[in-house]
Amino acid sequence: MEMIQAVRGTRDILPQEVRLWQQVEASAREILGRANYQEIRTPILELTELFARSIGSATDVVGKEMYSFSTRGEQEVSLRPENTAGVVRAYIQHGLQVAGDVQRLWYCGPMFRYERPQAGRQRQFHQLGVELLGSRDPRADAEVIALAWDLLRAVGAENLTLRLNSLGDPQDRRAYRQALVDYLTPLKEELDLDSQERLVRNPLRILDSKDPHTRTIAEQGPKLPDYLSADSRAFFEQVQAHLQALDIPYELDPYLVRGLDYYTHTAFEIVSPELGSQSTVCGGGRYDGLVEELGGPPTPAVGWAIGLERLVLLLQKKQQEIPPTSVEVYVISRGAKAEAQSLQIAQALRQAGFCTELDLSGSAFSKQFKRASRSGATWAVALGDAEAAAGEVQLKHLPTGQQQTLLQADLVKYLVSQR
């Protein structure tokens, strides 16, 4: 019978790699907790309208990449392609927008986009992100950027570059969008096919084209910073000043636009040259109009998301591995009575806090002792039916080979004393 494999664009994360993921997640929980960010968990399924109204119906994400379907009740739903929209929906739905309060939230979970699978880009992928809702203070922008920078460095990512730009307010963007369209329209036939399509639907995304000739054309055209209002420019300068005060290096990139329509003012990416074309490890920015667009009160907000697959890939390139959880005690048994008691012994050891593995093979003692040695355990607890009848065990210190007989009732107490 033919083997069933994982769906294309998805992958299994096996135990050895999971340990690296857990290290990243534990570091995030600690670093974000110190800044008083609270975890939020939202559904993987959302109404399709949520993403059409937030990300933008003209974006590639909504137009080409979402997994959408109709329910039996004829609702149009989608697997979430990102989670800012879901967090904002929950923020509005549950009345988290208490007047004057700032909400600091973080999340971690799977997202879904129908893209061409490659290293660092899967159709099911995972993001860890933060959202700070309720403040238009430029310190908020600097705070979330600093958290991302600290987290990436804490888990061992190196050679990172923070790229920074301002998209201005909606009026600034409209003025720049029109200038860009006016410049590119006569040159349309020289653009790559995707950019020709984007010229009509989402012209700012042309600045993010991977086609070298298109990028050259775009870089010779109007630049977004030239279209910022005085207020937008002043806000962006304050963000930069705060980053400088925090000793966080950055590069200004006038062509950085991000792929989602809801961004305003600050936009940023943290990239690594070690990841090739999929170099962005973290991306985010400010989205002051999104809460209102989704039916809430006017609420400024800023956030980011880290692509966990890309971050783990980056750490693996450094050959960073996390050692497995070490087995402390390996329980060996042979015979019906001994096997019955071995489960109780293993359970008592686990309840006492010992990492304990129970051999279930029923094979010869010699083979079980070999497995105990391979497991890396410090102690082997062995019993046959004779020990079971006497209420005893044989305790072997595997590094030295020293062995002794103990009453089962004294085993846990003795091992605790040897820690």
From Swiss-Prot:
Its main location: cytoplasm. One of its GO terms (molecular function) is ATP binding. Its EC number is 6.1.1.21. It catalyses: tRNA(His) + L-histidine + ATP = L-histidyl-tRNA(His) + AMP + diphosphate + H(+). CDD domains: HisRS-like_core, HisRS_anticodon. It comes from the Bacteria. GO terms for biological process: histidyl-tRNA aminoacylation. InterPro entries: aa-tRNA-synth_II (IPR006195), aa-tRNA-synth_II/BPL/LPL (IPR045864), Anticodon-bd (IPR004154), Anticodon-bd_dom_sf (IPR036621), His-tRNA-ligase (IPR015807), HisRS-like_core (IPR041715), HisRS/HisZ (IPR004516), HisRS_anticodon (IPR033656). The keyword NADP does not apply. Keywords: Aminoacyl-tRNA synthetase, ATP-binding, Cytoplasm, Ligase, Nucleotide-binding, Protein biosynthesis. It is found in: Cytoplasm. Disulfide bonds: none annotated. Belongs to the class-II aminoacyl-tRNA synthetase family. Homodimer. HAMAP family: His_tRNA_synth. This is Histidine--tRNA ligase. It comes from Synechococcus sp. (strain JA-3-3Ab).
